[in-house]
Every structure is written in structure tokens, then in C-alpha cells.
A protein has these predicted regions:
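Surface-exposed interaction/gating patches
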Residues: 2-17, 100-167, 171-172, 211-216
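An amphipathic, aromatic/His-enriched active-site/gating alpha helix that lines ligand/cofactor pockets
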Residues: 16-38, 45-47, 56-97, 131-149, ...
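Alpha-helical scaffold segments that form or flank carboxylate-/histidine-based iron centers
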Residues: 48-52, 160
Length: 217
């Protein structure tokens, strides 16, 4: 299974129109062409003007076939022309292809608030990072009320990243969960042991996301 993450950076003021187009048209076209839809999110914190969504396919060949059919679909062209009569809605598209790690659960959502985290591993340390998550971190997350949604690695290009998603009941639950996790002696012991020969993560980025009303659950 291949997952495609797409981030649409909207033209200023056009994010509501992008969401409306997905809700009223694009999602139905995706269903028509059997494009799997994991979720659609807007940023929860900060003045964001972007939509993040993740689709799924059986393979890269399956993705190319279905995306080509969708892109050539006359009703899609008509909707796009109508919704962009006063100018384009999307200023930039950023996409990446991913596959689930061997230890990842099947992606599903218990809440509407997720956190996407991207870890750029130190050179040669990605396997050690995977081991720490599978053997320690995931269990500690669950212990502290943090939902493990999914864990991915990128499959196109030379990537040294781990992309994962967590779930929370609300922002207060996020702060409580992370506070408990970070102060847990079991985490501190696991981290110290795994970093005996140096840090595993070079750069980390995270964003808080809220499922849109039209997103699958």
C-alpha cells in the first residue's frame, strides 16, 4: 500500500473555497476512481492557509493510473474551471509518497485532533529510530493517553525521515500526555540507552491538525 501526502498552500483567502471544492466535488471524484482517502486536515494552531490530505493506493502504478483518470475527467475540469473563474485557489502543491512501517497500526482515528511529526534521522540512524519506536516509544505513548495513528517512511528518493501521526482528545490532552511521557523514567532510560553512541534525530518538525468536516473518520 502506498500513501500520498499532499499539502495545498492556498492563495490568500482561498482556503474556504478549496475546502468547499473537496467537500462538494473532489471527494466524490476520488470515490469514483477508487482513490483511497485517509483524511483531510486544516492546521489547528497558527494562521495557516493550507490543506493537508493523505490518499492511498495499491501501488505506484495504481496511483499513476487512477490519478491520470481523475486528472483527465471532464466533470473535474468543469468544476475546476467554475471554481477558479476568479483565479486559482492553490498557490503551491507539495507531495510525498510513503509506506507504513512494519510496526505501524492500520491508520484510523478515534478523535478529530491529530499531530503530524516528521523526524529527520541522523545519517545511518533511521533503523535505530524505528527500533526505539517499536520497542519503547509506542507503548509509552499509549500509557500516557496518546493515540498511535500511523508511522510511515518515504519511498521515493533518498529519504532519512520518519513521518508519524498521533491523536488526542483535545489540546489540553496533548499537553498532559506529552508532559507525562517526557517525564516518565522508562522513556528517559530508553532514550539514554538508544543514544549512547549519539543522537538519533537531527531535526524534528510537528504540526497540529484538525480533521475537516468532510474528511473520512
Amino acid at each position: 500500500m502506498i500513501y500520498e501526502q499532499r499539502i495545498y498552500k492556498a492563495v490568500p483567502g482561498k482556503l474556504p473555497a478549496i475546502n468547499a471544492r473537496f467537500a462538494n466535488h473532489t471527494c466524490e471524484f476520488f470515490k469514483e476512481f477508487d482513490i483511497g482517502m485517509l483524511g483531510f486536515w486544516n492546521d489547528e494552531i497558527g494562521a495557516s492557509n493550507q490543506l493537508t490530505y493523505i490518499t492511498s493506493f495499491e501501488s505506484m502504478a495504481d496511483r499513476e493510473k487512477k490519478w491520470a483518470a481523475f486528472s483527465a475527467h471532464k466533470p473535474w475540469h468543469e468544476v475546476r474551471a467554475e471554481t477558479e473563474a476568479n483565479g486559482p485557489l492553490v498557490a503551491q502543491v507539495i507531495n510525498s509518497f510513503m509506506e507504513l512501517t512494519s510496526y505501524s497500526p492500520k491508520p484510523s482515528f478515534k478523535t478529530t485532533l491529530q499531530e503530524k511529526r516528521v523526524y529527520e534521522a541522523m545519517p545511518g540512524k533511521l533503523p535505530d529510530l524505528h527500533n526505539r519506536f517499536s520497542n519503547h516509544t509506542m507503548g509509552l505513548f499509549e500509557k500516557h493517553g496518546i493515540e498511535n495513528v500511523a508511522y510511515w517512511t518515504e519511498v521515493v528518493g533518498t529519504s532519512n525521515r520518519l513521518v508519524y501521526m498521533l491523536g488526542y482528545p483535545d489540546l489540553a490532552g496533548r499537553e498532559k500526555g506529552w508532559s507525562g511521557f517526557q517525564s516518565d523514567p522508562a522513556w528517559q532510560t530508553a532514550r539514554a540507552a538508544s543514544e549512547e553512541n549519539g543522537a538519533l534525530v537531527r531535526v524534528s518538525k510537528h504540526s497540529m491538525l484538525r480533521l475537516t468536516e468532510y474528511s473520512p473518520r
